[in-house]
Amino acid sequence: MSLHTGWPRTVNSSFLKKHRSSLCTCQHTSSVLPRSFSTTPDRHVQQSADFSSTSRSYDRLGRRAREKLLDREFFLSLLSSATTKREAKSYLARLKAQHPKSPDANKPEPEKSATAPTLPSGVNLGSFYGASRSVYESPVFRQGPSPSAPPSLEPVERLHLALVRLSTPQSLDDNIIDGVAKTLSQLNRLGLTCCVVVDPGTEGVASALRQVAIEQADRLAVAIQKQPDSKSLRLDSVFSIDPSRPGLPQVFSRKALLNPLRHGHTVILTPIAYTEDVPRAIIVPANDAVIALTKELAGLASIPDPDEDPMVTAERIGRLQKEVSLDRVILLDPLGGIPAFNRRQPSHVFINMEQEYDDIENELLQAREMVPATETSLLKAGPNSVADNNPISKFVHAEVVPVPSGSTPELKTAVPQRSAIEGHLENLRVAQKALAMLPAASSGIITSPFEVASSAQTSPTSEFSAVGTRRQRNPLIHNLLTDKPLLSSSLPMSRRGPTNNGQGAVYPVTSHTTFVKRGMPLTMLPNPWTEPWTPQSRPRLKLDDPSIDLPRLVHLIEDSFDRKLDVQDYLNRVNDRLAGLIIAGEYEGGAILTWELPPGVEDDGSEASNARMVPYLDKFAVLKRSQGAGGVADIVFNAMVRSCFPNGVCWRSRKNNPVNKWYFERSLGTWKLSDTNWTMFWTTPGLVEDSQKFRDYEAVCRSIQPSWADDTGVVD
């Protein structure tokens, strides 16, 4: 039975979609919906329509009002997740580009006439010389195959997906599950369809884990089904495995997986694979299921025939990759984001895998060795029983993300038997393996279901007034809109100060969400770990060194500043005072840093001269196509202030530079230089208290002459 016609309201309304899905979804029973409709009450309503038209109109008005309220709640959540209007517009532009109109969409369709055929001259002869209508419509029996229309050559619209792994949902209460379901529903409405893998954990026998996985998948499906304009479906028999060859499971049918996703369903999978020889259900690690799905959705699952032409193989894989774009890999784990032991923050905000993966993995491995063997008992004892001088122990006691106010699940059941650090290692590794198979534009998010659910909660004042305190940003919605983490990774901890949550409680703005990118390699010349950047370093690096691609560096500067550089004049100025160079990726971003002396101080190499040298950021550039996305600026800035110049650096910027807000947030201080168009910034601690050093910084920022070829017309 189809519900596409016969209703007075549009089929896209939440009311109709809700009940249409109850008839079309094969995996759910009537328990999915809070109500069921029988035919008898419907006939009774139809017979009494003349006497209850007023009540029916009120009912229709109430339903429309409820739908408007739900839409308003959705858009408020959407707008609150974007930090700026520019980011919201940028997302809408990307969404429009993902759904281009076909070139024939605006062409009027030719009218189909029910009349008889015409002569070539266009004269309609009616049915006089033609067969009657009954002859035209009579069935035709053919011995051979019926002629079929040629297949449509129009490309299938690309499906944008998020692959989600939800860990131990049995430890989460209904409020958390509902909040996660609401967020997944909102992602679907924003054009990012979700495929969820339920991870029951590793505690228990295989048969019990299979049952838990099925029950929790149904539980999440019901929660999603309750959301407006949402459909969910639990798929069975998705994975197959060869017991004779241990390894990753495989997706049994790509078509069976993609069809419900194309129809707007949130598909929920259990990590259960079936053996190929004798059908037998086997529980597999959820991370293996995530990797197998990533491999399939990336078009890399098929094994090429050795005798097949490589061009044919590449073309076949290319067609598969054009069908699906796996944009996000989302790991929802009660552990939250990847912890940062060496920094003054609870977790890594952003991880550039190409640059940081090995270091963070080694950091976690070292932390695991330091965890005491009695960690399970310590976890139950609480954080007060841990010595304050052991940062690793502090982390082990607080590895589960604090639950927001208003939610009080039993956190002790969310602590898995494996160590917390081992869980973070698995999250880091599965994110790295998945992103390695995906395009550079794809990204990963590691966060807690508590954080997602708390940001999805409806504000108590939203039903009455749109005026109120800005709600907490949803990390998943925010990342979809901006392709950025909730907090910039280059933002100092002092800038993540306390804020008011609208109820009188003050809490620190910290993020337990880690944003992960395959990223780009980072090159620092010279390597500050082997050759620290000091004024005494000799000989100094030069920009025309063979290890530097000068033409690409010049293009980076000119593209970023939108101005032509006087290359020779610039080389003459910086080559004898270059401190180092930072390059992100294939010259997508970079920084040129120098040692500068105040006017009147001679560079004679003496200790007094070296003591007066000022660490100066001469050029900070990011290609236009990489600005505002991908974290290129954060990667370069972090390398500068953490690795190259940890004791501080200064730079200047024109007072009307739109990037100054970004500089203000990341500097320790600023100073507007009088009688100039410059503002000085610095990250040096205690600079204001050191009057001599402050005067040197100011003198350098005043005295440096620009090296632009088109310097006329721009007042510096």
Swiss-Prot record:
InterPro entries in the record: GlcNAc_Synth_fun, Vertebrate-like_GNAT_dom
BP-aspect Gene Ontology terms: L-arginine biosynthetic process; ornithine biosynthetic process
Main location (coarse class): mitochondrion
Pathway(s) where this gene product acts: Amino-acid biosynthesis; L-arginine biosynthesis; N(2)-acetyl-L-ornithine from L-glutamate: step 1/4
Catalytic activity field: L-glutamate + acetyl-CoA = N-acetyl-L-glutamate + CoA + H(+)
Family statement: Belongs to the acetyltransferase family.
UniProt protein name: Amino-acid acetyltransferase, mitochondrial
Organism name: Aspergillus fumigatus (strain ATCC MYA-4609 / CBS 101355 / FGSC A1100 / Af293) (Neosartorya fumigata)
